[in-house]
Amino acid sequence: KKDGYPVNMEECRYNCWKNAYCDKLCKEKKGQSGYCYGWNLSCWCIGLPDNTNTKMNPFCQTAD
């Protein structure tokens, strides 16, 4: 298992405002839990399966 920022189909992080959104997202991705990381407003997941993609595309338009 690993911790990290999950990415979508375009390999961009999930932007967020609420911890509940990220916790649900992370659990859907088979993680243990998650929260909205305040410095960059992106979901951070704890306990994701090792094969979950957490490598972000450098061309993503993100809030950070």
Curated annotation (Swiss-Prot):
SUPFAM superfamilies named in the record: Scorpion toxin-like (SSF57095)
This protein's major location comes to: secreted
- Which Cys-Cys disulphide bridges does the record give? 12-60, 16-36, 22-43, 26-45
Q: List the keywords (alphabetical).
A: Disulfide bond, Ion channel impairing toxin, Neurotoxin, Secreted, Toxin, Voltage-gated sodium channel impairing toxin
Molecular function GO terms recorded? sodium channel inhibitor activity; toxin activity
Q: Where in the cell is it found?
A: Secreted
Keyword flag Metal-binding = no
CDD domains reported in the protein's UniProt record: neurotoxins_LC_scorpion (cd23106)
List the expressing tissues: Expressed by the venom gland.
Domain LCN-type CS-alpha/beta span(s) in chain numbering: 2-61
GO CC terms? extracellular region
**Free-text function comment from the UniProt entry:** Beta toxins bind at site-4 of sodium channels and shift the voltage of activation toward more negative potentials thereby affecting sodium channel activation and promoting spontaneous and repetitive firing. Has a selective effect toward Nav1.7/SCN9A which plays a role in pain mechanisms, and especially in the development of inflammatory pain. Shows no lethality toward mice.
Protein family (similarity comment): Belongs to the long (4 C-C) scorpion toxin superfamily. Sodium channel inhibitor family. Alpha subfamily.
Its domain comment says:
Has the structural arrangement of an alpha-helix connected to antiparallel beta-sheets by disulfide bonds (CS-alpha/beta).
Q: What else is known?
A: The protein sequence seems to be related to the alpha-toxins, however experimental data show that it has a clear beta-toxin activity.
Protein name per its UniProtKB record? Beta-toxin CeII8
> In which organism is this protein found?
Centruroides elegans
